[in-house]
Amino acid sequence: MDTYMLPFSMFSIKELLLEDGSSPFGNWFLKLDTQAAVKVQVALARMEQGNLSNVKWFRGIGEYKINWGPGIRIYFAKDGLNIILLLAGGDKSSQQKDIEIAVSRWHDYKFS
């Protein structure tokens, strides 16, 4: 699991790894253009510092909305008190599908 952490962080951010070792979030991130990738990195830094003001919760899944471009979303869950587990990424056009995928991944993670 890759970990992104700044000094004095409130949360430790980790990526969910599938059985084959791949990271759904990482694969999505690598396909972003440079501007979108920077926006996502800034959002992750804010999340790490405890700023979850742009988050809506759906069935235990957090959706961090980036108000820019296509409406980028980061889907995650809190695992324990201080770990944020990145499950997926997407945009407004795939929002419903992305939420269902994130919920399924979170369920599989919790009960495996």
Segments from the language model and where they lie:
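Basic, Lys/Arg-enriched alpha-helical interface segments
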Residues: 1-71, 80-84, 91-112
